[in-house]
C-alpha cells in the first residue's frame, strides 16, 4: 500500500475510533444526567413525604376545638366574683366535653382566659385579642363601661359577647352582638313588683312604695322609670316620689323625713353598694320602719346591723338549696356571686347557637342571634338579645338570708 492510501486509511480508522469514543462519552454523560434527574426526583419525593407526614402529625396533635373567650376582671375589685364565674363556665365546658362535645363531629370546647382588670380599655383590647385567637364568642365583661365599649368593638369584629352580670337594658338594646344571660333591669323591676303584689313579702303587708330617683346616670333614671311603670300596672300604690341629687347626710335626712311622713311600706332606691350604709343609717335616724327593695349589687352588704329587711332580685340566690348551687359547691366551694348561674348558662347558649346554625365554629355570622331556649343538667335557660322575660328571678330577704 502506498503512503498516500495508507495515510487515508489510517485517517479514516482514526476518525472512526474518535467517533466511537465520542459516542461513548455522550452515552456516559446521558446516564449521568439521568442519574442526577432521578436523584433530584427522589429528593423531591422524600421532602414532600416528610412534609405530608409532619402535617399529618401536626393535625393529629392539634385537633380542631371550639374556642370560647372569657373576659372578666380577674385582678381588680371584682376578682373573686370573676373567678367564681370562670369556674362556673369551666363546669359547663367539662360537662359538654364529657357528653360528646359540640356538633356531630364532637368538637371539644377550649377556654381562653383574659383579664381586663375592670378597665374598659383593657376590655376592648382583650376582646380583639380573643377574636384574633379564634374565639367564636366571648363571655364577659363584668364592668358596665367595658360593655358599652364592646358594643362598638363587636359590631366591627362580629364576635358576639354574652354578659353574665351587666343588666343595663340600654347597653344591650343598642347592640347587634351583645346578649344577656342574666336578667335585664326591666325584667328585674317587673319581678320585684310581682313579688310585692303576691304578698310573699311576709315582713310587711303595707303595699305602698316610695320611689327615689338618684340623679347619677341614665341607668338610675331608667331603673326608676321601669319600677314606676311596673308598680302602676299592679295593685300597689306609689305614695312618694323624689329625685335625689346626692348622698350627703342633709339630703338623705330630708329624703327620709318625707318617706316617713308618706308611711311608705317599701323604699326603692337604685343606688350602688357604696351608698347603702349612708342610706340605711339615714333611714334609721329618721325612724323609718318599712323595708327596702335593692339591686343585685346590694347582696354582698350586711344590712343586719340596721335591722331592715332588704329584698333583692337575684339570678340565683346563693343560699338557696338548688341543684346548681349544690353542684357548684361540691366542685368548687362556696358561692357568693350572682353571676354564677348566668355564666354557666352562657356556655350552653353558645353550644346551642352553634348546633342550631346561628353561630359558626370559627367566627360568628353577621346576624343577630334570636332568643334561644335550651336545657342544661341544672335546669332550663332563655337567653336573647334583650329583655329575657322568661328568666327565673329569685327574690331573697336579707335578714338571716332567708329565701322567700
Regions found by a protein language model. Give the residues of each.
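Short beta-strand elements at the ligand-binding edges of bilobed clamshell
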Residues: 170-195, 306-318
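Extracytoplasmic "Venus flytrap"
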Residues: 69-90, 114-120, 143, 216-221, ...
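An alpha-beta-alpha
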Residues: 178-243, 350
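Periplasmic-binding protein-like
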Residues: 70, 130-142, 162-164, 208-213, ...
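Beta-alpha junction/loop-to-helix N-cap segments that form part of ligand/metal-binding clefts
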Residues: 56-60, 80-87, 102-172, 244-253, ...
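Extracellular/periplasmic periplasmic-binding protein-like sensory domains
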Residues: 280-344, 355
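Segments of small-molecule ligand-sensing domains
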Residues: 328-341, 351-400
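C-terminal motif of bacterial Sec signal peptides marking the signal peptidase cleavage site
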Residues: 49-51
Amino acid at each position: 500500500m502506498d503512503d498516500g492510501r495508507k495515510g487515508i486509511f489510517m485517517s479514516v480508522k482514526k476518525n472512526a475510533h474518535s467517533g466511537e469514543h465520542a459516542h461513548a462519552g455522550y452515552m456516559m454523560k446521558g446516564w449521568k444526567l439521568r442519574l442526577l434527574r432521578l436523584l433530584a426526583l427522589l429528593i423531591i419525593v422524600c421532602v414532600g413525604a416528610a412534609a405530608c407526614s409532619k402535617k399529618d402529625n401536626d393535625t393529629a396533635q392539634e385537633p380542631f376545638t371550639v374556642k370560647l373567650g372569657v373576659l372578666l376582671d380577674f385582678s381588680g375589685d371584682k376578682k373573686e366574683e370573676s373567678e367564681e364565674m370562670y369556674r362556673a363556665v369551666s363546669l359547663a365546658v367539662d360537662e359538654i366535653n364529657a357528653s360528646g362535645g359540640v356538633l356531630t363531629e364532637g368538637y371539644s370546647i377550649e377556654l381562653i382566659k383574659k383579664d381586663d382588670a375592670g378597665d374598659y380599655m383593657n376590655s376592648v383590647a382583650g376582646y380583639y385579642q380573643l377574636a384574633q385567637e379564634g374565639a367564636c364568642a366571648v363571655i364577659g365583661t363584668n364592668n358596665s363601661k367595658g360593655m358599652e365599649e364592646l358594643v362598638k368593638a363587636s359590631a366591627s369584629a362580629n364576635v358576639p359577647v354574652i354578659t353574665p352580670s351587666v343588666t343595663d337594658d340600654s347597653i344591650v338594646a343598642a347592640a347587634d352582638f351583645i346578649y344577656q344571660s342574666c336578667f335585664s333591669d326591666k325584667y328585674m323591676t317587673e319581678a320585684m313588683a310581682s313579688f310585692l303584689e303576691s304578698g310573699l313579702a311576709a315582713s310587711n303587708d303595707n303595699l305602698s312604695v316610695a320611689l327615689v330617683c338618684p340623679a347619677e346616670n341614665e341607668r338610675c333614671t331608667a331603673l326608676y322609670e321601669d319600677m314606676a311603670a311596673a308598680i302602676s300596672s299592679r295593685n300597689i300604690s306609689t305614695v312618694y316620689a323624689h329625685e335625689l341629687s346626692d348622698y350627703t347626710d342633709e339630703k338623705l335626712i330630708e329624703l327620709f323625713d318625707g318617706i316617713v311622713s308618706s308611711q311608705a311600706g317599701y323604699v326603692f332606691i337604685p343606688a350602688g353598694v357604696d351608698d347603702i350604709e349612708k342610706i340605711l343609717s339615714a333611714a334609721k335616724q329618721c325612724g323609718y320602719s318599712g323595708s327596702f327593695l335593692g339591686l343585685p349589687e346590694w347582696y354582698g352588704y350586711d344590712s343586719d346591723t340596721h335591722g331592715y329587711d332588704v329584698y333583692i332580685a337575684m339570678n340565683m340566690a346563693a343560699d338557696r338549696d338548688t341543684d346548681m348551687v349544690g353542684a357548684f359547691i361540691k366542685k368548687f366551694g362556696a358561692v357568693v356571686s350572682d353571676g354564677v348561674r348566668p355564666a354557666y348558662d352562657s356556655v350552653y347558649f353558645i353550644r346551642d347557637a352553634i348546633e342550631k346554625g346561628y353561630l359558626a365554629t370559627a367566627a360568628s355570622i353577621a346576624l343577630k342571634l334570636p332568643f334561644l331556649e335550651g336545657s342544661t343538667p341544672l335546669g332550663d335557660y332563655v337567653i336573647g338579645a334583650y329583655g329575657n322575660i322568661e328568666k327565673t328571678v329569685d327574690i331573697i330577704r336579707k335578714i338571716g338570708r332567708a329565701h322567700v
